[in-house]
Amino acid sequence: MIMEQNIFNAVYKVNHAGGSGSCFYLKNYDLFVTNYHVVDGFREVALQDNDKNRFYARVVLVNPAKDIAFLKAEGDFSALPEIALSALDSVSIGQKINVAGYPFGMPFTVTEGTVSSPRQLINDSYYIQTDAAVNPGNSGGPMFNDRDELVAITASKITDADNMGFGIPVTALRELLEQIGDLDTSVYNVQCNSCDEFISDEEEYCPSCGDKLPSNVFQERSLTDLAVFCEEAIQAMGINPVLARVGYESWVFHKGSSEIRMFVYQRSYLFCTSPINVLPKKNLEPVLTYLLNAEVKPYQLGLDGNQIYLSYRIHISADNL
């Protein structure tokens, strides 16, 4: 199955304080598409391309019933390729598809598979079932056919079941796109699944039809005290902490040319590390001797594989924070 590699440039990673997922760009709408469950509890996220460039994005529309969310990002994406949506009934059993995304938060990958069922009924909704490898982090990414057309949004896999992944058919996305002509992308909107009304003010029931809205759909996840402490420090350096988030109590950002990583280790220590060089291939003894004996307090020099790091460690306690 040969695909136009350029199409994958429109697939991005979604990062926030809860983890990561995948998304893709629809050029005609200037919106990124992902799963609702990928951004559930977050209004602000960071999008990352294959070259690790990051872009601030806001969640502007969610439909929990369809498990679809739209993101509006800051930046110029006009150079990205246009993703075409497949015809309504173009998926059949045995058809080849590609699942693109960032499984487990790893670099971009594409896995090939076939359609096991074009209309698999699960919890009153139809999904495309595939035997392609689908893992956490793939959610929100695209499923393409052999004509580079979008056939589904990768949604999930059955836990502990190999070769069984599911995608939201492109028909659900088409329906949503047809309704967003008057969408206010400056605010967060929830779409009522009963009457399709867009609701931007926090409500328990839809003001148009009275249908009960999903619980917590307007609620944002709170950061831990430690995360607030770290993000205040990141903000003080002139860096948007939203762009630095790469998971729960974990951040990666650049200060000048240096990459800095902040993370919690074994719930006991907060580490700040920066990779500074790699070990030489020969004559290691002088370098290793220096790493063992150099006085760089309060910092430490260390190794991870062949990468030399400069680190700072602090025990997590109320007194230290």
Where are these regions (language model features)?
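Residue-level recognition of beta-strand microenvironments
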Residues: V60-V62, Y102, P118, D146, ...
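Catalytic nucleophile loop of clan PA
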Residues: F24, A133-T154
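Short beta->alpha transition motifs characteristic of CBS
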Residues: N35-D40, T111, P136, A152-D160, ...
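Short, internal acidic amphipathic alpha-helical interface segments
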Residues: Y269-R313
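Long, charge-rich boundary regions
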Residues: V217-K282
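Conserved active-site neighborhood of the chymotrypsin/trypsin-like protease fold
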Residues: F8-N9, K13-S20, K27-A100, G105-F108, ...
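Short, small/polar residue-rich loop motifs at catalytic or cofactor-binding pockets
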Residues: A17-S20, N135-S139, A161
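C-terminal cap/linker of serine protease catalytic domains
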Residues: M1-E4, P103, I153-V217
